[in-house]
C-alpha cells in the first residue's frame, strides 16, 4: 500500500507558497523574474518562512546588483554568513562576473576540492573564456564549492533578471558537454600535450595534464549530479515573480516555457505591487491602475490555472530589515485581505 499522501486540487492551487514550504524533499528553490518586480524581497521572505520549517537554509544572490545586503541591512559576501536574528538562515552573494583567473589559479594547498587547482596557464584561460556563459559559470562554481563543503537542507537562489537566470540554469548542461569534450581530447592527444607541457616546465602548481583532467572530471560528475537534481521536481522548483503589467506577464510566460524546455518544475507565481483602493476612492490614477491590474490578473489566472498564484499588495514603505521582511513573508503563507 502506498504511503503517498492524497493531495487535493484545492490544496495545490491555494494562493500561497505553503505547499513549497511544506515540501520537505525540496533542496533547490529558484526565485526569478523581470527586473524591478520584487525578486529579492520575495526570495528573502520565502527563505524566512523556510527557516521556520527546515534545519538549515542558505539564501544565495546570483544577481550582480546584490540586494540581499540592502534587504537585511547586513553586509554579505562570497562566504555564507548567518543572517542577524536567525540561527539557521545564512546568506551569501556570488559575483557572476568574478575573476575567472581565481578558478584557474594554481592549485597549491587546495586539498581535495575538485573546484580548486585548475592552474592551466594563459592558454587554458583563453580556452575557458571561449566557453559560452562563462560569467554564469563563475556563479555556479562558487555555489558548488559552498554546497560541497557545507550541508544546507535547502538552498534559495535570488537570481539575476530573466535572461541571465535562464542561462545560469542551462549552464550545468553546457559545462557537462564542454568537460566531456575536453576529456575526449585528452584521451586522444594527452601524451603529446604532456610532452609539450613537460618541455615548458609543466602546469602551474607542478601538476601534469592527467591530474588536471582528473580534477575536471570530478567537477563534471558533481555538476552532472546537481543537474539531475535540477530536473527532479521533488528536489527543485522555480518561483516566478511578476507584476500585473503586460511586459512582466510576457516575460513570465517566456520564462515558464523555457523552464519547461529545461525540465525544471515551476508551479508558483508571486504577483507583487497590487493596488487595492478603498471603496468609493476618488483617486482616478489608483482606480485606473487597479482596473489595468485586474485585467492582467485575470489573464494570469486563466493562463496558469494549475499554479499557486500569490497576490501581494503594494506597500506604503520599502520592505527592508528583518521586521518588515517577516511581515511581508507572512503574506506569502497567509493571503492578504484588503481592508474594506
Curated annotation (Swiss-Prot):
The protein's Enzyme Commission number: 3.6.-.-
Positions of the catalytic residues: 63
Keyword set, alphabetical order: ATP-binding, Cytoplasm, Endoplasmic reticulum, Hydrolase, Metal-binding, Nucleotide-binding, Transport, Zinc
GO process terms (BP): cellular response to oxidative stress; pheromone-dependent signal transduction involved in conjugation with cellular fusion; post-translational protein targeting to endoplasmic reticulum membrane; response to heat; response to metal ion; retrograde vesicle-mediated transport, Golgi to endoplasmic reticulum; tail-anchored membrane protein insertion into ER membrane
One Pfam family hit: ArsA_ATPase
Annotated GO MF terms: ATP binding; ATP hydrolysis activity; guanyl-nucleotide exchange factor activity; identical protein binding; metal ion binding; protein folding chaperone; unfolded protein binding
Annotated positions binding Zn(2+): 283, 286
Coiled coil (residue ranges): none
InterPro entries in the cross-refs: Anion-transp_ATPase-like_dom, ATPase_ArsA/GET3, ATPase_ArsA/GET3_euk, P-loop_NTPase
Residues annotated as transmembrane: none
Record-listed ATP binding positions: 34-41, 245, 272
Family: Belongs to the arsA ATPase family.
Function text: ATPase required for the post-translational delivery of tail-anchored (TA) proteins to the endoplasmic reticulum. Recognizes and selectively binds the transmembrane domain of TA proteins in the cytosol. This complex then targets to the endoplasmic reticulum by membrane-bound receptors, where the tail-anchored protein is released for insertion. This process is regulated by ATP binding and hydrolysis. ATP binding drives the homodimer towards the closed dimer state, facilitating recognition of newly synthesized TA membrane proteins. ATP hydrolysis is required for insertion.
HAMAP family: Asna1_Get3
Self-association and partners: Homodimer.
Protein name: ATPase get3
Organism the protein comes from: Emericella nidulans (strain FGSC A4 / ATCC 38163 / CBS 112.46 / NRRL 194 / M139)
Amino acid at each position: 500500500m502506498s504511503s503517498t499522501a492524497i493531495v487535493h486540487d484545492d490544496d495545490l492551487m491555494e494562493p500561497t507558497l505553503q505547499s513549497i514550504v511544506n515540501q520537505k524533499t525540496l533542496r533547490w528553490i529558484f526565485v526569478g523574474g523581470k527586473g524591478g518586480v520584487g525578486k529579492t524581497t520575495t526570495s528573502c521572505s520565502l527563505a524566512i518562512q523556510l527557516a521556520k520549517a527546515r534545519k538549515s537554509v542558505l539564501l544565495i544572490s546570483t544577481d550582480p546588483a546584490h540586494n540581499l545586503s540592502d534587504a537585511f541591512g547586513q553586509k554579505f559576501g562570497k562566504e555564507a554568513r548567518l543572517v542577524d536574528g536567525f540561527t539557521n538562515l545564512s546568506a551569501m552573494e556570488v559575483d557572476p562576473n568574478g575573476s575567472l583567473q581565481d578558478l584557474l589559479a594554481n592549485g597549491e594547498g587546495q586539498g581535495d576540492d575538485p573546484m580548486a587547482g585548475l592552474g592551466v596557464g594563459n592558454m587554458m584561460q583563453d580556452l575557458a573564456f571561449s566557453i559560452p556563459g562563462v560569467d554564469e559559470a563563475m556563479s555556479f562554481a562558487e555555489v558548488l564549492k559552498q554546497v560541497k563543503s557545507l550541508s544546507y537542507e535547502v538552498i534559495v537562489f535570488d537570481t539575476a533578471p530573466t535572461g541571465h537566470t535562464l542561462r545560469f540554469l542551462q549552464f550545468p548542461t553546457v559545462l557537462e558537454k564542454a568537460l566531456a569534450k575536453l576529456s575526449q581530447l585528452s584521451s586522444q592527444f594527452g601524451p603529446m600535450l604532456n610532452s609539450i607541457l613537460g618541455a615548458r616546465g609543466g602546469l602551474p602548481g607542478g601538476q601534469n595534464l592527467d591530474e588536471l583532467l582528473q580534477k575536471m572530471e570530478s567537477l563534471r560528475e558533481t555538476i552532472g549530479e546537481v543537474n539531475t537534481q535540477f530536473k527532479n521536481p521533488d528536489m527543485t522548483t522555480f518561483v516566478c515573480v511578476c507584476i500585473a503589467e503586460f511586459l512582466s506577464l510576457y516575460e513570465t510566460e517566456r520564462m515558464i516555457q523555457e523552464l519547461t524546455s529545461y525540465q525544471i518544475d515551476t508551479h508558483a507565481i508571486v504577483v507583487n505591487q497590487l493596488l487595492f483602493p478603498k471603496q468609493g476612492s476618488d483617486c482616478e490614477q489608483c482606480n485606473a491602475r487597479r482596473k489595468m491590474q485586474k485585467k492582467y490578473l485575470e489573464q494570469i489566472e486563466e493562463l496558469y490555472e494549475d499554479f499557486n498564484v500569490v497576490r501581494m499588495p503594494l506597500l506604503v514603505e520599502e520592505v527592508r530589515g528583518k521586521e518588515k521582511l517577516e511581515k511581508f513573508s507572512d503574506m506569502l503563507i497567509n493571503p492578504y485581505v484588503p481592508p474594506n
